[in-house]
């Protein structure tokens, strides 16, 4: 009976450590790194995002055999739209693929690249994210 209780406590302690082993990230901290070494990808998690994580790369370093990309936690902005990369010099309204805005009543989303607080390229599309004003 004592061995059984000790085993249960051991399992509970292991679960507690594994679920709370990482501290919450501060906004300026690197949350995790993706390391690609000779085609093999691994992740080094440094802290836990409080919110649903959004891949926001902050730095990329390369040497002969390794590429390391560092990511921070970031909340998705309320207004996002995408453009095909070959049309970035054109006005964003003419070439917008999809606009997704959830601004509060009475607010609107800035919709020009100069007002973007962030832009990301995935494939052949550049996505801008904006704050509501």
UniProtKB/Swiss-Prot annotation:
Name of the protein: U-scoloptoxin(11)-Sm1a
Organ and tissue specificity: Expressed by the venom gland.
GO CC annotation terms, alphabetical: extracellular region
Subcellular location: Secreted
A single GO molecular function term of this UniProt record: toxin activity
Similarity remark: Belongs to the scoloptoxin-11 family.
Cleaved signal peptide residues: 1-19
Reported modifications of this chain: Contains 10 disulfide bonds.
Keywords noted in UniProt: Disulfide bond, Secreted, Signal, Toxin
């Amino acid at each position: 009976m004592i061995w059984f209780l000790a085993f249960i406590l051991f399992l509970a302690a292991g679960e507690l450590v594994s679920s709370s082993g990482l501290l919450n990230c501060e906004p300026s901290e690197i949350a995790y790194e993706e390391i690609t070494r000779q085609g093999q990808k691994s992740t080094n998690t440094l802290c836990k995002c409080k919110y649903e994580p959004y891949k926001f790369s902050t730095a990329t370093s390369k040497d002969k055999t390794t590429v390391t990309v560092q990511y921070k936690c970031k909340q998705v902005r309320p207004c996002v739209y995408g453009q095909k990369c070959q049309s970035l010099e054109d006005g964003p309204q003419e070439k917008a693929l999809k606009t997704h805005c959830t601004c509060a009543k009475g607010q609107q989303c800035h919709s020009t690249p100069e007002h973007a607080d962030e832009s990301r390229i995935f494939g052949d599309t550049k996505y801008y994210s904006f704050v509501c004003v």
